[in-house]
Amino acid sequence: MGTRENLRNVAIIAHVDHGKTTLVDQLLRQSGIFRANEQVAERVMDSNDLERERGITILSKNTAVMYGDTKINIVDTPGHADFGGEVERILLMVDGVLLLVDAFEGCMPQTRFVLKKALGLGKRPVVVINKIDRDGARPYEVIDELLDLFIELDADEDQLDFPVIFASGRDGYASLDPDAREGDMRPLFEAILEHVPAPQGDPDGPLQILFSNIDYDDYTGRIGVGRVERGRVRTGQTITLCKRDGTTQNARIGKLYQFEGLRRAECETASLGDLVSVTGIPDLNIGETACDPEHVEALPFVHIDEPTISMIFMVNNSPFAGREGKYVTSRNIRDRLFKEIETNVSMRVEETDTTDAFKVSGRGELSLSILIETMRRQGFEFAVSRPQVILKTGPNGETLEPMELLVIEVPEQYVGVVMERLGSRKAEIVNMGTRDTGISHLEFRIPSRGLMGYRQQFLTDTNGNGIMNSLFDGYEPYKGEIPQRVQGSLVVHETGETCAYGLWGAQDRGALFVGPGIPVYEGMIVGQSPRDEDIVVNVCKKKHVTNTRASGSDEALRLVPPTILSLEQSLEFINDDELVEVTPESIRLRKRILSKELRLKAESRKKQK
């Protein structure tokens, strides 16, 4: 067994918006990766447009910095459990983790998810208390909370003895002293070298590379990203690929890359512990092992948690179908969905009874909405159904459903309304406390079904002052019926273009989602009814002009500004008999059955059954 002392592989674990990507920016800048005259974007690790817009990391990225003679490979992990398939694979590539925690907010549920995975794999953490200069920072309380969390997650003695660094990623300093307000990142670099183990293994043994990620390049095809677990690899080397189904195939390494800063740099060889990208292996999939042909030994791959939520993706069949999208056929949608699961191991795609609909299952609403938004930006046009939880059958034949741990922080005056709403959704409170700032901290266990459609209600109930985070927490026996959206929809009467007079008449019937001058079709949803039934409205109605003058002048029509729903809000809003139509230019809501007469017939048949 050998050890590579000049290399460290470390992953960063952090909750959304705790400053992970900004901290990596500083490590890159202070290690001299960028030239003095180089223009550098903010948050360089969030390379995807969606990531920059939402401030979240969806795909893990690799970067490398040099500190003295030591190369430090840093892997940025998604901070959300919906992307847990990414998280679990990435932890296989590293020997230690940086646990980044906000000095005010402390450890949040999504951090807990990734940390649990890391501790379970025996990774040693270095704790970084970030945003130490923030108003209301409480570093010592946060450390106590972390210690309690580590104990709760069954950390061993080595893991409990974690080093703590206090930092400000924004201002670019780190220190062992929480009161320091200047300096550089050197203390953090030193902590990584001291506490993250160097890669261990046999540097001269037969080759083994475990591929934990797949990239795609139109020029070179599939690129396998993995770690050299044993031996060394060189360009042009013949290898045997151990597939996940137990079969093997021979291949030749095309090009070999390592990470330098944020880019891939071509290299001739790589050895024990290096994170490499490899081209030239056809049909390569995540979790497969490249071996020496003389010593074929597959490495075990991590178990990926199963999906908990599914949706139906279908061809758009509305009257406006094909107007705005570039890829609209079932073949286009099918190819894109199956391409997604080649690199996204936590997602499943199944064909349905019809050729124009596909069942897509994922780890949560967020991961599915990110897929929808990505496809939309790529020019796809399609319709999606309301998300449904995936039920299981227990050992005694009972029905099991997914549960979530829900953590809520709200000002004290909103605690009553939050508890009342969640009580009706079958939530059980497991923890409750109030901080000195007057913010109440509530923890619930709730069926995943109960959370669907609640986020928007929560923001309304708390006037936007609440924070909620949830985390998958296993399966339990089915909790019974949960009341869904009680309000009906405002449904369009005829195809046309909305006009001020028609909207003015409709706004008294409910809250509108569209303004004037918007093309609409029969069966499209343009608002929310306050009653528990749908109301058909004529938003295209124009005021008839007569040759009779009114005694008084016509009053100008005053329209209430419409509520424009985002993609997530649209998915939360719809009921089982409704769909979201997604195109590159529009997000529309509609009834599954567009004709009012056919809807009434379908309802009467349903009642007769």
What name fits each language-model region?
Residues 1-105, 145, 214-217:
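P-loop NTPase switch module centered on the Walker A-proximal segment
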Residues 230-232, 282-283, 362-368, 412-415, ...:
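Helix N-cap motif at beta-to-alpha junctions
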Residues 208-311, 319-323, 487, 496-546, ...:
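Conserved nucleotide-binding/hydrolysis modules and their immediate coupling elements
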Residues 259, 264-267, 400, 446, ...:
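Long insertion/accessory domains within large nucleic-acid-processing enzymes
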Residues 241, 318-341, 556, 560:
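A short, contiguous, amphipathic alpha-helix enriched in charged residues
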Residues 39-43, 127, 153-165, 199-210, ...:
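Interdomain boundary/hinge elements
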Residues 168, 352-367:
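Short glycine/threonine-rich beta-strand-turn micro-motifs
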Residues 124, 134-194:
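Canonical P-loop GTPase G-domain recognition
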